[in-house]
Amino acid sequence: MVSCWDTAVLPYALLGCLLLTGYGSGSKLKVPELSLKGTQHVMQAGQTLFLKCRGEAAHSWSLPTTVSQEDKRLSITPPSACGRDNRQFCSTLTLDTAQANHTGLYTCRYLPTSTSKKKKAESSIYIFVSDAGSPFIEMHTDIPKLVHMTEGRQLIIPCRVTSPNVTVTLKKFPFDTLTPDGQRITWDSRRGFIIANATYKEIGLLNCEATVNGHLYQTNYLTHRQTNTILDVQIRPPSPVRLLHGQTLVLNCTATTELNTRVQMSWNYPGKATKRASIRQRIDRSHSHNNVFHSVLKINNVESRDKGLYTCRVKSGSSFQSFNTSVHVYEKGFISVKHRKQPVQETTAGRRSYRLSMKVKAFPSPEIVWLKDGSPATLKSARYLVHGYSLIIKDVTTEDAGDYTILLGIKQSRLFKNLTATLIVNVKPQIYEKSVSSLPSPPLYPLGSRQVLTCTVYGIPRPTITWLWHPCHHNHSKERYDFCTENEESFILDPSSNLGNRIESISQRMTVIEGTNKTVSTLVVADSQTPGIYSCRAFNKIGTVERNIKFYVTDVPNGFHVSLEKMPAEGEDLKLSCVVNKFLYRDITWILLRTVNNRTMHHSISKQKMATTQDYSITLNLVIKNVSLEDSGTYACRARNIYTGEDILRKTEVLVRDSEAPHLLQNLSDYEVSISGSTTLDCQARGVPAPQITWFKNNHKIQQEPGIILGPGNSTLFIERVTEEDEGVYRCRATNQKGAVESAAYLTVQGTSDKSNLELITLTCTCVAATLFWLLLTLFIRKLKRSSSEVKTDYLSIIMDPDEVPLDEQCERLPYDASKWEFARERLKLGKSLGRGAFGKVVQASAFGIKKSPTCRTVAVKMLKEGATASEYKALMTELKILTHIGHHLNVVNLLGACTKQGGPLMVIVEYCKYGNLSNYLKSKRDLFCLNKDAALHMELKKESLEPGLEQGQKPRLDSVSSSSVTSSSFPEDRSVSDVEGDEDYSEISKQPLTMEDLISYSFQVARGMEFLSSRKCIHRDLAARNILLSENNVVKICDFGLARDIYKNPDYVRRGDTRLPLKWMAPESIFDKVYSTKSDVWSYGVLLWEIFSLGGSPYPGVQMDEDFCSRLKEGMRMRTPEYATPEIYQIMLDCWHKDPKERPRFAELVEKLGDLLQANVQQDGKDYIPLNAILTRNSSFTYSTPTFSEDLFKDGFADPHFHSGSSDDVRYVNAFKFMSLERIKTFEELSPNSTSMFEDYQLDTSTLLGSPLLKRFTWTETKPKASMKIDLRIASKSKEAGLSDLPRPSFCFSSCGHIRPVQDDESELGKESCCSPPPDYNSVVLYSSPPA
């Protein structure tokens, strides 16, 4: 069947085929007719080209290569029936706004068929688009176009034109002109210049020139002759080629030549005489600048006779090249591996790469696996790359130290080898203070002060630290300042050296900072007197680092001080002083600041004195004589900082006061005084400048003498023990430059001298007795305070410098203030036992008058068991001292008192919390949990309506809630001891529903309590829900932050070696490195959050507490989000579980975040909002949805949270904060559940005795050669994990849940029916990784 296809018109292809079928019986097809006749047509640029093709069959168009089919100006209509009886096909081509580059041959041809193949089935016309500005179709002005030529063959220079009338000249650089002669060189406006037999003369740069309307146009071409140059010959695979007997040998010889080069390729090989090889050749022309020839030699089933030298020969004309390769044929495989260097290798941290290589000889090529410390290296880090038999470590760090093993295996030969090398990563010493110091200018040290200089160094091997002293250079020239430089002569310091300042001590200690052991060197300067530079130099075999501490001593506060002697008056002298530290400032001068047109101008002050230089400072005094009012203004001392180059100003305002004549505020008046008495005369005068006051008696000037005292400024006259001679006229005179004023009075003395002496004796005795009394009282008080202050000083030093003294010794030194905490045993009535610890017990008691309360108070008493040892007594006493040190806080179980005196047991009295620990309380509330207060309120109303028996005195059934911890109310409430009253209180709280607000509140309170404990340098080390106690008014308190606990019977404590540890709550650094810090408490707080929002669920349910759990935790696996946690809460958990302790939030930050959540949950108000978890819709029941954590969920920062919700109009919201983008989180496997009771889910964490077997590693063993061996690189399967049971799902809010109306702002009543959320399912456990660092 004849196939017919038209690229332009699909619908008419079938019709064309049918028509052709009719003509195929013997009719001849006429060639297609074009609407433009002739072989060529000339049109102007910008005109529209219209061509119509009429034919007897379906046809298509062929266009010049410069015309794009996608050009919007081109339009081709598909062939359609036309002519008589519609037996012809017509198609049109329209090209709008034709351009010069549209010049070319346009062809209309029939679609190929069996009928038209033998005949001319096309019509063509050459269209010239004439453009005076573009005479050539292609312009090559900057870069000539390459034209390949072969001598003796035709060469075409394709400088085609857009008009047949353009005259073109062909020139050869530099001055030759090639003129067409009609034979050897001809011109064709459609093709260009045609050279029949090209010679070497046409090699070079040719250009075509045309002049149109007086403008010269050029297009350039570069001819290139074919050569015989062989660029390269290679054989693949490279030499040597190794094969096993019976394999196939394939050698590919590749010859690279220049274009237009032809080659002859041949082989020489051992079996050439017998033609052992088959050879095939091919040419690769895909390269634009070269030709590539291939000759492939192949020998099947190689034998020993095929080994030897194989040579590929390449020849092109007179050029010849060859390439050799050697072939080796082996009977069987082999492996040999040795150390290329030493078994223990060293490198340096910071290197861009390090190659760990082995000397391996093997055939065939073995499988290679590198292990680091027993695990695949490439899986541990992307920085590990396997290259051949080498392992390349990129960007070497200290984490790369360890044992590296290369595993080599040839499965088909059953050959296996391994070899281990140890890598030590050395670190150049690093001084951490040097990296964090960013002050532009050095600090100043007060004269005579005691200073402590520290230098924290890290390096491998451990660096040696020395302190050096560089004295300052003293310059006695007045033109230069003193300066200090580290290039001066340096001296090594020791505590006994007398260089520079007196050294109190030089000490070193090891400490763990940010998880690494660092050396802290401390230099204590006892008395800062001499300026200079202290250098801390640390060195090891890798290198040396030095930190220079410029030690500039100053006797000027802050190094810059300006003072004004006094505010001057008109006519007085203005005296200003400027003092700067001479090591920090220079170019000191006084200037006057003036404001002109809102711009501050600096005016220099003439006739300034020279600055004087002292030992530590430079002083510049400014004195202006006889000032006037115009001298008022802002005076500034300007000095240039030597290090920053910045001009520093210190300003002082000067206001020159106008002169004012003196005047008296009150005149003197006559006065009578008894003999032996005393009197005071006041003469208060004002004036500018301040007047000078002079006293006269009977016109004689009074001078100060015994019995006559002149007060400040002579304004008062005090006469002691008046005698008869003191009677007379007293006159005071106030004088300044504006004038004088005076006042006088007569002093009359009454009485006799005998009476005066008696009074004098009596007064003297009284004063002496009073003085002795106050002196004795002062000495007594100071003696009482002395011991207390000394103990307090020692105590503070212990707390503030914990690394100087061991922790147990610190606790032993802590003071115990018996006057504050001691409580009489006879006022304490012991009651029932609350629990027993490792060496103590806790009992409930009633304390009468504790904390100065006039009533009885229920408390908890911690005391030792019978037969306690001295060490146990010391431990409980240490706990008591710690509690006194920590202090009082609302969210901490507080100390109330203690009984330590002889004659009875040691007892520690703390607060009593009657509602037990938070873990059991949350478990008891699983069937009473509601999402918000509205649902909780409706739930209570529903219960009241369905439980009439309670109103008739029927006692409700309570879930059993036990507590093993000491508790008390957080509020100082005095009440009588009454168990019935306590039971009634608990009955009330047991009936109250638990809401989401309560869970957030518990989390917030615990964060506040831990923030307080961390501020008191207290690390809890066992923060869990079992150690959180619930008190009245929904207040939670942290306990057991120092109390002994019975870890031997508690299933939450797992044995590791000889120690039981709460592994589920412990941070990785605590498990593996025994490092406890506030950041490890933050990790435990994250697990506590999981307990709270799972309503008392046990962490990692169903996961066996073994070494596998620890390794998976270290690899980044985490728990899945608990049932009732919102995305914000779960994000906080992940933040707390960050692998790097430094990236975990501080408790202060957790308080802030949870405080925002709590406030938003209460007020339903905030900035940015997302749905919490309770959604009220108009047309759906009250539902609860657990957020699905996926990649999509975290993609847009919870912009579109994945909650099951209906309408979003009536949604309750909680204030949100930004989330970090999370990678896909690794999870624990989900486990099949087993049956268990709700209150026994903690028993899933049963104590697991962890032995000491190593973690599973990759090991290969060798056996006899004939034995079956294989390499198995799979990790051993994980141990079976204990499952969780299906928890019973009790009915919430009773069996039916009605629809709830949306809560509107103006509604005050809830719907008649409501529903709480279902209980959590703790059977599915998913492990999450911490967010990326």
UniProtKB/Swiss-Prot annotation:
Keywords: Angiogenesis, ATP-binding, Cell membrane, Chemotaxis, Developmental protein, Differentiation, Disulfide bond, Endosome, Glycoprotein, Immunoglobulin domain, Kinase, Membrane, Nucleotide-binding, Phosphoprotein, Receptor, Repeat, Signal, Transferase, Transmembrane, Transmembrane helix, Tyrosine-protein kinase, Ubl conjugation. The active site is at D1022 (proton acceptor). Glycans are attached at N101, N165, N197, N252, N324, N418, N475, N517, N598, N626, N667, N714. It comes from the Eukaryota. Residues 23-759 are extracellular. It is found in: Cell membrane; Endosome. It catalyses: L-tyrosyl-[protein] + ATP = O-phospho-L-tyrosyl-[protein] + ADP + H(+). GO terms for cellular component: endosome; extracellular space; nucleus; plasma membrane; receptor complex. Residues 947-983 are annotated as: Disordered. ATP binds at L834, G835, R836, G837, A838, F839, G840, K841, V842, K862. It is an enzyme of class 2 (transferase). The chain crosses the membrane at residues 760-781. Its EC number is 2.7.10.1. Residues 828-1158 form the Protein kinase domain. Residues 960-970 have a biased composition (Low complexity). It holds the Pfam family VEGFR-2_TMD. Disruption phenotype: Embryonic lethality at about 9 dpc, due to defects in the formation and organization of the vascular network. Mice display abnormal blood island structures in the yolk sac, leading to defects in the organization of the vascular endothelium, excess growth and disorganization of embryonic and extraembryonic vasculature, including the endocardium and the microvasculature. Reduced vascular sprout formation and migration. Loss of retinal hyaloid vessel regression from postnatal day 3 (P3) to P8. Mice expressing a mutant protein that lacks the kinase domain survive and have no apparent phenotype. Its main location: membrane. It is a single-pass type I membrane protein. GO terms for molecular function: ATP binding; identical protein binding; protein homodimerization activity; vascular endothelial growth factor receptor activity. GO terms for biological process: angiogenesis; blood vessel morphogenesis; branching involved in blood vessel morphogenesis; cell differentiation; cell migration; chemotaxis; embryonic morphogenesis; hyaloid vascular plexus regression. Residues 782-1333 are cytoplasmic. Residues 1-22 form the signal peptide. This is Vascular endothelial growth factor receptor 1. It comes from Mus musculus (Mouse).
